Curated annotation (Swiss-Prot):
Family: Belongs to the alpha-IPM synthase/homocitrate synthase family. LeuA type 1 subfamily.
Protein name, as recorded: Probable 2-isopropylmalate synthase
Tissue expression profile of the protein: Exclusively expressed in mature nodules.
Listed Pfam families: HCS_D2, HMGL-like, LeuA_dimer
Gene source species: Glycine max (Soybean)
Lineage: superkingdom: Eukaryota
Length: 565
């Protein structure tokens, strides 16, 4: 049974419109734009962005705070772990109804394959509002070289799979035309008409390779509206990639010309150059919807944008550029003397959007601070304010690490807390944990590392190794114990806090040896994903080792999921 909860999704003073009643194929208010967030599906396809089920659940709960209409939490048939994560989100997040009746649609992604569709339905059917999102390529290059099927065969598959999805009991079905912007127009109109007749309630127009200009996408939406049989009875959606840096502009133009569902990701993460950014699209609509976009609006609670962005950044390991619009470190920082003078006289001189609208706090650039005298309740409250829903034992675990840090640093900032939670979020699921570490390095001879790891079964294992530097020797020692061939794809260090007692965040990205970096494919061939790890410590080497273990444990859990599938 759905549970009644009170969420902030309807409490922002900016939300003057009521959310229209949810009907799969119709929006009672023609000015309302649905937001489908695919951070947990397409966003996770970014190399190194693989997330655990717990991390996905945390982000899904944060998306509810935002008031996202549809959450696409994954591709259930990709692996057993993906299936379980989507099912858990459907059960827990997909039944949390707020006081205004809002509950997100939980949408499982699947190819136009019966097994995929059945698996996706088994994962999402527990939600109050389940949806199936099935997709097939419609462009000549994809049909010829990837699918190796004729137009007639693709149309038949699309028709049959939408009907099959309907037969399972799902009444909310999205059909996606992959690479729609490079598809033959007449063929696109035809296949969309066929799936609408078969029972699709939303049709998704994908600019899969991010190749079109805004005017071209707008013209495509208008042409689809004018030439597709039955199009008035469904919702038109867009899914824009950012290969030319036009994803946000294309998405806004799609909405202006008739799309009433927009697929986006937090921070714009996704395949290759990423997807349209939720924060950019939503704030563009909020800022210009009344004046330039004929009154278009969403029900996104923008005050939760920043904390959601930071959570996704930490869990995915995808660091933001400082100049990233709205959520980058420099987005509301004014360094020029002329700009500072203008800001002192009137903030509107250089800010058209108030940073408070998206959750920034001007009181300090690094957030509210806690110290060594702070208790667990103060810590719990601050973690809740930052968007983290931790169990009692998880808070206790973070608390003792927080106290240890506070003894050394005197003050612990929001950034410190987020780094701690980011590590703890996965640490509980670890197969291997760091016991002890000793490293000898310098200008004479090779570096030597001695590592003790603790296995999930309680056994301890010790190994020594030499290498070129502390990191190399330590990783080699770990590999002697774990015996899992890996390749280090990326390694970076970042000082995430201010002051003398610097807390260093290490981020690593690994894959299995001889692996491709692509994390997703529509083919039957399994492409091993890449895995990122992030950890924060005051000791650079310890931080680096813990980050590597986080990534390594994710890889091992991923292998386990295939054995269980």
């Amino acid at each position: 049974m759905p549970t009644k909860t009170s969420t902030p999704s309807s409490q922002s003073p900016k939300l003057s419109h009521l959310r229209p009643q949810y009907i799969p194929n119709h929006i009672p208010d023609s000015s309302y734009v649905r937001i489908l967030d695919t951070t947990l599906r397409d966003g996770e396809q970014s190399p190194g962005a693989t997330m655990t089920a717990k991390e996905k659940l945390d982000i899904a709960r944060q998306l509810v705070k935002l008031g996202v209409d549809i959450i696409q939490p994954g591709f259930p048939s990709a692996s057993n772990s993906d299936f379980m994560a989507v099912k858990m989100i459907a059960q827990e997040v997909g039944n949390a109804v707020d006081d205004d009746g809002y509950v997100p649609v939980i949408a499982g992604f699947c190819r136009c394959v019966e097994k995929d569709i059945s698996t996706a339905w088994e994962a999402v059917k527990y939600a109050k509002r389940p949806r199936l999102c099935t997709s097939i390529a419609t462009s000549p290059i994809h049909m010829e070289h990837k699918l190796r099927k004729s137009k007639d065969q693709v149309i038949q598959i699309a028709r049959d799979m939408v009907k099959f999805a309907r037969s399972l009991g799902c009444n909310d079905i999205q059909f996606g035309a992959e690479d729609a912007t490079r598809s033959d127009r007449e063929f696109l109109y035809e296949i969309l008409g066929v799936v609408i007749e078969a029972g699709a309630t939303t049709v998704n127009i994908a600019d899969t390779v991010g190749i079109v200009m805004p005017l071209e996408l707008g013209k495509l939406i208008v042409d689809i509206k004018d030439n597709t049989p039955g199009i008035a009875n469904v919702i038109i959606s867009t899914h824009c990639h950012n290969d030319l840096g036009l994803a946000t502009a294309n998405t806004i133009e799609g909405a202006r010309t008739g799309a009433r569902q927009l697929e986006v990701t937090i921070n714009g993460i996704g395949e290759r150059a990423g997807n349209a950014s939720l924060e950019e699209v939503v704030m563009a609509l909020a800022s210009k919807g009344d004046h330039a976009l004929n009154g278009l609006y969403t029900r996104i609670n923008t005050r939760h944008i920043l904390e959601t962005s930071k959570m996704v950044e930490e869990y995915s390991g995808m660091h933001l550029q400082p100049h990233k619009p709205l959520v980058g470190a420099n987005a509301f920082v004014h360094a020029s003397g002329i700009h500072q003078d203008g800001m002192l006289k009137h903030k509107g001189t250089y800010e058209t959007i108030s940073p408070e609208e998206i959750g920034h706090k001007r009181t300090t650039r690094i957030g509210i601070v806690l110290g060594k005298l702070s208790g667990s309740q103060a810590l719990r409250k601050r973690l809740e304010e930052l968007g983290y829903d931790l169990k009692e034992d998880e808070v206790d675990s973070v608390f003792w690490q927080f106290k240890a840090m506070a003894e050394k640093k005197k003050v612990v900032t929001d950034v410190d807390l987020k780094a701690l939670v980011s590590y703890k979020a996965f640490h509980a699921e670890s197969i291997w944990k760091l016991g002890d570490l000793q490293v000898t390095c310098g200008t004479i001879g090779l570096s030597t590392a001695t590592v003790k790891l603790v296995n999930i079964d309680g056994s301890t294992h010790v190994a020594c190794s030499i290498g070129i530097g502390a990191v190399d020797s330590t990783y080699k020692a770990i590999n002697l114990i774990v015996k899992e061939p890996t390749k280090l794809l990326d390694y970076s260090l970042n000082s995430v806090t201010e002051g003398i007692g610097v807390n260093v965040t290490a981020r690593v990205v690994i894959c299995r040896e001889n692996n491709h970096t692509s994390t997703y494919a529509f083919t039957e061939d399994a492409n091993y994903p890449t895995f990122s790890g992030i950890a924060a410590e005051m000791d650079v080497v310890v931080s680096t080792v813990k980050a590597y273990l986080v990534a390594l444990n994710k890889l091992l859990r991923w292998k386990e999921s295939f054995r269980c599938a």
